[in-house]
């Protein structure tokens, strides 16, 4: 017997009201690529000057770009890259391949993504599937060989943008960069230029000197925006995002000032303005007001890190607690082996069965993926590799959550941590 067709309950009808606030909220999102970039003309000109030789068939210098989050690094590179692609149609062909290394963070993935992007550029959808390197299953040498073949067939210049390049190095070491910075010596009809983008100003410290010398032929630092510059950016986006007279200069100025206090982060300013508008929209208001900005800031500043630590499984908390103990003793960087040794002591003190070496390593990787800790792989040549672990930001909030758990308060081995917590160190 056929079941009756599903009948909607109309759950969302009460939320679909005539929109009086937004005409296009998408222009306030990080993914939006503006046609103009206020207060980044100097940086645009610098990158364009470095890449200009590509239009005459030469290989441009590799570039490392630094700057804090929300300083316009990615948007600027994409803007210049698009201009170069368009103008190169009259000269020597150039293409931009943009990879986000927060997710594409292994040598296999990087090489495969570049090859698949380049080979699929001029193919129809059905042919792209046939020419795709699988997500797993090939030896890295095979992927590298296929990448060289793809580049040779494509010809021209491929500008490889490795966004958040520090994440790739910390996860997988610098072998990927070593290979990419030397790939031109294996090519005849094609060339590669690399642009690395990082918000970690100490990123270079993680690189082998040979890789660094090849990668950082040119370096640019993007300064934070000030309040006036952020105000200009918000005005530009607000004209497209909101209906006329919905947002006042006072509201835009407040969003800009708040974001300027957060290291001149344009992303933060855009988020604050967008969430303020969404709160006004839900309220049924006709204007975005200061109270909406204040509420939006509270929403955005909800301590997601504390919530994340609170919901960790017990074993993950024990691993994290072991790192906190080491940090409390003055250590700033730990190896996975030393963390596992302390973990076993803490687990024994808590009368908890210790997990295997491999499982603890998995938990360390999970903590890294959550952003609670940061890991980097350090190569020792013939002696192999070591995973180094550190806290990128102060541990006060993490320690507070852990030590509010009664199980850890009663653990004798953690008394130094408890004393630090009580002192507020």
UniProtKB/Swiss-Prot annotation:
Name listed for the protein in its UniProt record: ORC1-type DNA replication protein
BP GO annotations: DNA replication
Any matching Pfam family: Cdc6_C
UniProt keywords, alphabetically: ATP-binding, DNA replication, Nucleotide-binding
Keyword Nucleotide-binding: yes
Function summary: Involved in regulation of DNA replication.
Family the entry assigns: Belongs to the CDC6/cdc18 family.
Binding site for ATP: 71-75, 225, 237
InterPro entries with a match to the protein in the record: AAA+_ATPase, ATPase_AAA_core, Cdc6_C, Cdc6_lid, ORC1/CDC6, Orc1/Cdc6_arc, P-loop_NTPase, WH-like_DNA-bd_sf
